[in-house]
Amino acid sequence: MNHLFPHFSFRRPALALAAASLLLATACSAPRAIVATGKVTPQGEFRVGYNQGFNIATAPIDKAGAALKNAASTAARKDTVGYGGAVNSLQAAALAYILDPVQPTADLSIRYGIMPHLDAGYKYAFGSHVFDAQYQFLGPTGSPENPDHGAVSGTTYASIGLQFATQRAKLPSLPFLSDINSVLNFRATRNDLLIPLIISQSFGPEEEIGAISYGLVYAHSWVSYGFAPNNVYLNTQKIPALPTQSRNFSSFGGFVNLKLGYRYFYVIPAVSVFYQNYGDYALLNGASTSLSGVTFVPSLGFQLRIPNFTK
């Protein structure tokens, strides 16, 4: 994508950024880092961003100990695998990594100010497509070049967002997860809805030099999954595949981020924390497992603001 901006060329940095993203994003995951502020994109302006983070979830860490990794490696080398507790543990680990993986995350985004209080955008998270909108219900709606009346340093802004992500989920590229998948033939899809309530205080008029933001987040996820192993047996009977199952769960969290820069370019460190009870999940041969945990999402974002030069 080419961006025009007076006196500067962003082509090389953009290409380098895209290449770095491809290297760092090892698996697809719906982005949950909140790097927005309470102020939406001013009408007629664009914002282009890149965000790099890390999803640190306790559920998959709990399910993936050294013994399980060894069991996965051993099972992957066998022509037939005996059904038992180890197979159930492999399934639980696969589910935990799909529901909330431990992995790097990255996304490229673009936003546009549709009207004074509303903007919308698209994110590509390397396998996950994300569409979102944000409505500002508190604070002025001008720009650093044309600040609204009352826009001074310390002004409070507030908004509410709506983000929808869809993806064909896959396990992260880790050797023991590849072993699990070769045994279980695991498949999954998921959709995610995220609603952040964002409050921020401006640094300079209309966030000219940045802002500090914080707030609460509600998220809801819908997951479909199944297992279709070819060589798992109980005695002499082959274990049948698990038909596609559908589950959904809610997440609750909070976040804080710091936007620092000047007018056109900003750096945004952020951290989000979520708690979720994923619920109960059916496994092969009538078994089941339940999962819950906490997720930490530290991130670092970069944002380029493209003003409306027609004003």
Predicted features and spans:
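Bacterial N-terminal signal peptides that target proteins for export
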Residues: 2-15
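C-terminal motif of bacterial Sec signal peptides marking the signal peptidase cleavage site
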Residues: 24-27
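Transmembrane beta-barrel domains of Gram-negative outer membranes and organellar outer membranes
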Residues: 29-158, 165, 296
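Outer-membrane beta-barrel transmembrane domain signature
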Residues: 51-70, 75-89, 173-311
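Outer-membrane beta-barrel domain signature
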Residues: 93-94, 106-107, 114, 124-126, ...
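Long amphipathic alpha-helical segments with strong coiled-coil/leucine-zipper propensity
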Residues: 159-161, 174
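Short amphipathic beta-strand and strand-loop transition segments with alternating hydrophobic
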Residues: 162-164, 218
